[in-house]
Curated annotation (Swiss-Prot):
Part of the ABC transporter complex MalEFGK involved in maltose/maltodextrin import. Responsible for energy coupling to the transport system. NCBIfam families: PRK11000.1, PRK11650.1. Transmembrane segments: none annotated. Pfam families: ABC_tran, OB_MalK. GO terms for molecular function: ABC-type maltose transporter activity; ATP binding; ATP hydrolysis activity. Its EC number is 7.5.2.1. This is Maltose/maltodextrin import ATP-binding protein MalK. It comes from Mannheimia succiniciproducens (strain KCTC 0769BP / MBEL55E). The lineage of its organism: Bacteria, Pseudomonadati, Pseudomonadota, Gammaproteobacteria, Pasteurellales.
Amino acid sequence: MANVSLRNVGKSYGDVHISKDINLEINEGEFVVFVGPSGCGKSTLLRMIAGLEDITTGELYIGEKLMNDVEPSKRGIGMVFQSYALYPHLDVADNMSFGLKLAGVKKNERDQRVNQVAEILQLAHLLDRKPKALSGGQRQRVAIGRTLVSQPEVFLLDEPLSNLDAALRVQMRVEISKLHKKLNRTMIYVTHDQVEAMTLADKIVVLNAGGVAQVGKPLELYHYPANRFVAGFIGSPKMNFLPVKVTAVEENQVKIELPDANHHNFWIPVSGEGVNIGENLSLGIRPEHLVPAEQAQVSLRGIVQVVELLGNETQIHLEIPEIKQPSLIYRQNDVILVNEGDEMNIGIVPERCHLFKEDGTACQRLFAEKGV
């Protein structure tokens, strides 16, 4: 088990910058998830930690040792890729022990490590099977087991669940979470799926355009995003955004005007620092934080465009006539029977709102959310 430190790390190919000025501290035994859209540099960052990509600028430390020029095999890391990369002609036991055999580990010790890891991953009854006789989830566990038997100090996982169907992804998320708690190893996990990030991580690193957009615990990022990008990326369905104008500013609250027919004005409990009267901002509110109109002092009138009945919840896409933008999503943990074209009023609770400046940075929220 070891800590990982990245100090002003960058990667470029000629004049093209893939990652830039990455500063991260990953503690011993921590489960950290790198998340972001395709092309944001998350897999490149993981490969730099693994030693599969050279670091152009900055320094990488694993366990307080500078690793920039250390070979991958000597970094004390183990890596699981999106592809299982199992040898089809070898059984599970031989696949798991293959790396140990190449490293010259004696057979008795190889067998002992394989059996211990097989018990942890519930593979003991499959050790004599070939990969073709295994399910997708079992193959992924074998790939994880192959890494575990090498006893790495840092465990790297590059989108390991991407090839699995939805049900298996849920199952393997649970298995990986249990595995981390049991082993207490430092784990760094890459995914584009923010649901995986929210459910697995002790700490999430949100990446965008090769840089760090925000680092924090899952609920911190959900309730207190540092910028509009993080607010829109974390959460499913994603946050709604409405254009608003500032009409008054105080130290601990900002008054805004909605662009609807009634031009509603109301105060939002956020820091007024750096906000000016007349400024155009973005109001953010999550679909699950909208409420029935009778439960709020401020409401919006919308036209129902699409209704998604999911059994345990309903998601309604609304068009706000005065606002030319993508539809507003309203989510409730109940069955709501409405039809396309119906008028519907929804309520806004100021305490659950976010405000973002024109440059995308968030006004500091002052409402205390549970669990943060």
